[in-house]
Amino acid sequence: MTRIKRLTCFDIPKINKMIEHLGNGDTTRFQHELNNEALIAINGLVPLKYKFMPETYILSDKDEIMGLITVVPTRGNPYKINITKLIFQQNSYNAGKQLVEFIIARYGAKGAVSFCANVDQTHDELLNLFLNGCGFRQCSYENLWELKNFIPREPQKASFRYCQNSDAPDVARLYNSELNTLYKPSMERIKQEYKEPFFAGLVNFYKNRYVLEDPMTHRIIAYLSITTTDHRNFTIDISTNDGYQISYDEVINFALSEISRRKTNFNAYIKHRQYTKTADGFEKYLHERNLDCIQTKCVLIKDFYRPVKQQENVLQVFLLGETVN
């Protein structure tokens, strides 16, 4: 008989055997994350609005683990749930489907309003599971470009400053204004997602945030974040106002200089989100710099709707041709 339960420290040895096929770096990092999660139980005891750490559930059949799924609430908006890991045994499509449906039902009952998964476009079986098996829809794509041998045409660095919590409303407004209209209902963010949470030191990644202002009006015209999970591989993410001519060379120069202040040997990547108004121009720039796109992920979204309980035995009164319930 199969059952789904929270991951515990007693499950780790079985999980380690299950993920032996992963690359050495991925296996070590994955094991470290699961070990930390299994030892911190407080996150599982609090309501959804206070959750901030990953939670992993396993599907087991007697003593055999058939699959696992990890979810992470969005920082500042825990009602948006991100599915970050889904592993199941080969030819166990139904196990993956059970885990996803379990997460949607469990967190939906707690108040979650949307679920997101970013799936590599080469994983056909996983895409089929989410799209056809679990009712997700594909919104757009996110690409990752490697900044290897990046040679800027301009040596200057943009004059970013550290982002403060007081900047959050303006940054959220900037991000949302740059979304293509088609994707706004699913991809919009609230200001709390751009505030530094009090538990920042407990999450399994490190992020620096910066903003660029118009020197005349002090209006925020660009937002930059630098994220790493291992202090070796850094991902740069940029949001810019398409009404301003902002030099990507200067933005990247600044980002690389910030990373090099802390690390001498590192790998840098930049995210390209295809659902923004600046996506085409940014992609053209990346090609002109002879950079390589090393990964494309499909952004999959599922909105959770609670069924509305309908009133029974409603009396209808007809008055002057109008129906009043």
Predicted regions and their residues:
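A structural feature that tracks compact, well-ordered secondary-structure segments
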Residues: 70, 102, 118-120, 129, ...
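Long, hydrophobic/aromatic-enriched structural stretches that serve as scaffold segments
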Residues: 58-98, 103-104
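Conserved GNAT acetyl-CoA-binding A-motif
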Residues: 107-120, 262-275
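Conserved acetyl-CoA binding element of GNAT-fold acetyltransferases
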Residues: 78-90, 231-245
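Internal, hydrophobic cores of structured domains that mediate oligomerization or house catalytic pockets
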Residues: 106-107, 113-151
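Amide-forming acyltransferase catalytic core, primarily the GNAT-like/NAT-type
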Residues: 2-66, 135-232
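Active-site/acyl-donor-binding loops of N-acyltransferases
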Residues: 133-154, 265-325
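Conserved acetyl-CoA-binding loop-helix of GNAT-fold acetyltransferases
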Residues: 91-106, 245-260
